[in-house]
A protein has these predicted regions:
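Conserved, mostly hydrophobic/aromatic
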Residues: 7, 73, 94, 133, ...
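Metal- or metallocofactor-binding catalytic centers and their adjacent structured scaffolds
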Residues: 38, 52-54, 69-144
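Hydrophobic faces of well-ordered beta-strands that scaffold small-molecule active sites
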Residues: 78, 159-166, 181-183, 216-220, ...
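Glycine-rich, aromatic-flanked loop segments that form ligand/cofactor-binding clefts
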Residues: 125-128, 134-170
C-alpha cells in the first residue's frame, strides 16, 4: 500500500446554520414549495401537520460532510444526510475502520461498517452515515487515480445524460428543456372524496398546461393506501400519467403487489426510502416495481447502489436513483440502462433550478436545456467552496 492510498485522517462536519449549502439544499425563504406547500405525506392524517411538511420536521436532521485524507494529503469529500446523529456515528464508530486502511478497499470498509452497526443500524441514519463515508472513499480513489468516478465503476456508457425535473410548475420546467416533470400529489386518503376530486383537477390542470405528450409523473410520498392508489390511478387514466411514484409505505411490499395486479400496464416506481440491497430483495425478485429509485446518499452509497443495480438487471428492472446530484450522475453515466436522472427545482417557487448542494461545492455540474455531459474531472469533480460553512464534530 502506498502513501497515496493509506488513510491517515477522517474529519466529519455538520453545516453552519447560516451556510447557503447542504444536502438537497433549499435557499432561505419565507416559504419553499418542497416543505411549505400542501403535499400529501405520511403525517397528513394529523390536521396539525397536514398543511406543511416543515411542521413535522422533515429535514430536521440536516446534512453532514465527510473528509477522508490519505498520507500524501489527498482528500476525498462527500456530503450526505443525517446531520449530527450521522456525523457522530462516523466520528466515534466508523472512523476506526478507516484509519490506516487502504482507501481502495471500499467493499471491505463498507462491510465492516454495516456489520459493526447491526445492533442499532440496518436502515435510516446509520445507513446514511455509511453512504457519506462510501461516497467520500470513491471521491478519494478517483482523485488519487486522476480519474472520474464513472471510470472506476465500468467507464462511460453514454456521452450525455438527460433529466426530468421535480417541480410544482411543470410548464416552467418544460420551457427549460427538461424531458418531463414530476409533481407532488396534494391530497391523500384523509382528505376524502373531495380530496380525490381535487387531486384529479390538479393533475388535469397540469396536463392541460404541458400538453398531451409531455411526460408527467406523480410523487405520492408514501401517503396513499392500496385502495386509494388503485382508484386514483384508474380515474386519472385519461391524463396519461407517465408513472406513479412511492404511493405506499416502504414496508408494504404486499401492497405494491396488489396495486401492480390491479393496474399491470401502468408504471409504478418506488424505493427512495428503502435501505441497502436487503431492502430491495423482494421488490426485485417478485417484480413488484417497474423502476427502482434508491437514493445514493441514503441507500448505502455508490457501492450499495451498484449491488442493487446488478441484482435488478437480472430481472430487467431499471434503476434510476432519487435525486443525489452528481453521485447519481456518475452512476447513470456508467450504466447501460436508462440514460436519465432526476433534478429537483430547488428555487423557492420551483420554477428554476439551482445547484443541488447550494454553495457547498465548487464544480457541481448542472443540466443545460435538460441535458448534461459529465466532465472528466477526478473523483466526483467537486471541492469544498468555503470551510467557514463547516462545523467540525469532535
Amino acid at each position: 500500500m502506498t502513501k497515496a492510498f493509506r488513510i491517515r485522517a477522517v474529519r466529519v462536519h455538520t453545516l453552519n446554520p447560516a451556510a447557503r449549502a447542504g444536502t438537497y439544499f433549499m435557499p432561505g425563504a419565507a416559504e419553499h414549495w418542497l416543505v411549505d406547500s400542501l403535499i400529501a405525506n405520511p403525517m397528513s392524517g394529523y390536521a396539525r401537520y397536514r398543511e406543511r411538511r416543515s411542521s413535522w420536521g422533515i429535514g430536521v436532521l440536516g446534512s453532514l460532510v465527510v473528509e477522508i485524507e490519505t498520507e500524501d494529503g489527498t482528500v476525498g469529500v462527500a456530503t450526505g444526510s443525517g446531520g449530527m446523529p450521522a456525523a457522530w456515528i462516523v466520528r466515534h464508530h466508523f472512523a476506526r475502520f478507516l484509519i490506516g486502511q487502504d482507501a481502495r478497499n471500499i467493499n471491505l470498509i463498507w462491510d465492516q461498517m454495516y456489520r459493526a452497526s447491526l445492533p442499532y443500524g440496518r436502515k435510516g441514519v446509520t445507513i446514511m452515515a455509511i453512504s457519506a463515508v462510501d461516497l467520500a472513499l470513491w471521491d478519494l480513489v478517483g482523485k488519487v487515480r486522476g480519474e472520474p468516478v464513472y471510470n472506476l465503476i465500468g467507464g462511460r456508457s453514454r456521452d450525455e445524460i438527460t433529466f426530468y425535473c421535480t417541480t410544482p410548475e411543470p410548464a416552467a420546467i418544460k420551457a427549460l428543456g427538461f424531458w418531463g416533470a414530476k409533481v407532488p400529489l396534494p391530497h391523500g386518503p384523509f382528505d376524502g372524496e373531495a380530496g380525490l376530486r381535487a387531486n384529479l383537477d390538479f393533475l388535469a390542470a397540469h396536463r392541460a398546461a404541458v400538453g398531451p405528450d409531455f411526460p408527467l409523473m406523480v410523487d405520492c410520498y408514501m401517503s396513499l393506501t392500496v385502495s386509494y392508489a388503485i382508484r386514483l390511478a384508474e380515474a386519472a387514466r385519461p391524463l396519461n400519467i407517465h408513472w406513479w411514484e412511492e404511493v405506499l409505505s416502504p414496508e408494504d411490499d404486499d401492497g405494491y403487489r396488489a396495486i401492480k395486479a390491479a393496474h399491470p400496464t401502468l408504471t409504478w416506481t418506488t424505493a427512495e426510502h428503502e435501505y441497502t440491497r436487503y431492502g430491495f430483495r423482494q421488490l426485485i425478485a417478485d417484480r413488484l416495481i417497474d423502476i427502482l429509485q434508491p437514493d445514493v446518499m441514503w441507500v448505502g452509497g455508490l457501492t450499495e447502489t451498484l449491488r442493487i443495480a446488478a441484482h435488478a438487471a437480472a430481472y430487467d428492472t431499471p434503476v434510476v436513483p432519487h435525486g443525489s446530484g452528481p453521485y447519481s450522475y456518475h452512476f447513470i453515466a456508467s450504466q447501460t440502462g436508462p440514460a436519465f436522472c432526476e433534478y429537483v427545482a430547488a428555487s423557492a417557487d420551483g420554477k428554476t433550478i439551482q445547484p443541488v448542494f447550494g454553495d457547498l461545492f465548487v464544480g457541481e455540474p448542472m443540466p443545460v436545456n435538460g441535458r448534461m455531459t459529465l466532465p472528466a474531472t477526478p473523483g466526483f469533480g467537486m471541492e469544498l467552496r468555503d470551510r467557514a460553512m463547516l462545523v467540525e464534530v469532535a
